[in-house]
């Protein structure tokens, strides 16, 4: 009985350590500084996590003022259950899957514009060094959309 218990504990520890190691080696996981493509100011920090189903989501963890503009704290324009939720903790991107043909690309995601409240289809591409993420939100086909680049902390 003691051997079985020791084996179970060892297995759980190994699984936990393996999961932590995997997350540390996953270049998309971590904290990112968003850069507004229109003003070039950093508006927020987003924490990207890998979910148990293998998809990625990003949660807003910090917001900043743009000089001369009022700081927004609540997502008044967001749809559905996200309406009137605070920006901090708000799911901002979700459903992204790593492209099996290109591990630096992530596809089939959704992107929330927390200012306008619209949800767009999304795709993302990591730089070769894993320090920059180009995120594209679009309607229909990716030609009709806009891209932003984030910087990893």
What residue spans do the PLM features occupy?
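Bacterial N-terminal signal peptides that target proteins for export
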Residues: 1-9
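Boundary at the C-terminal end of the N-terminal hydrophobic targeting segment
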Residues: 21-25
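Edge beta-strand at a domain terminus
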Residues: 130-132, 138-153
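Central antiparallel beta-sheet cores of small beta-barrel/beta-sandwich binding domains
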Residues: 34-122
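K/E-rich alpha-helical interaction surfaces of small helical-bundle regulatory domains
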Residues: 26-42, 146-153
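Structural motif
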Residues: 31, 55, 130-132
């Amino acid at each position: 009985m003691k051997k079985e218990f020791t084996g179970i504990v060892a297995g759980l520890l190994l699984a936990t350590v393996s999961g932590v190691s995997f997350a540390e080696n996953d270049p998309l996981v971590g904290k990112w500084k968003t850069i507004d493509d229109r003003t070039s100011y950093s508006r927020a920090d987003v924490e990207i996590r890998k979910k148990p189903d293998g998809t990625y989501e990003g949660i807003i963890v910090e917001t900043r003022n743009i000089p001369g503009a009022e700081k927004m704290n609540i997502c008044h324009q967001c749809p559905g259950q996200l309406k009137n939720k605070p920006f901090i903790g708000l799911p901002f991107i979700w459903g992204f899957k790593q492209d099996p043909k290109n591990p630096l690309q992530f596809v089939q995601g959704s992107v929330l514009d927390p200012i306008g409240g619209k949800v767009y289809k999304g795709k993302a591409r990591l730089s070769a060094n894993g320090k920059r993420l180009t995120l594209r939100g679009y309607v229909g086909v990716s030609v009709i959309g806009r891209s932003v680049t984030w910087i990893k902390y």
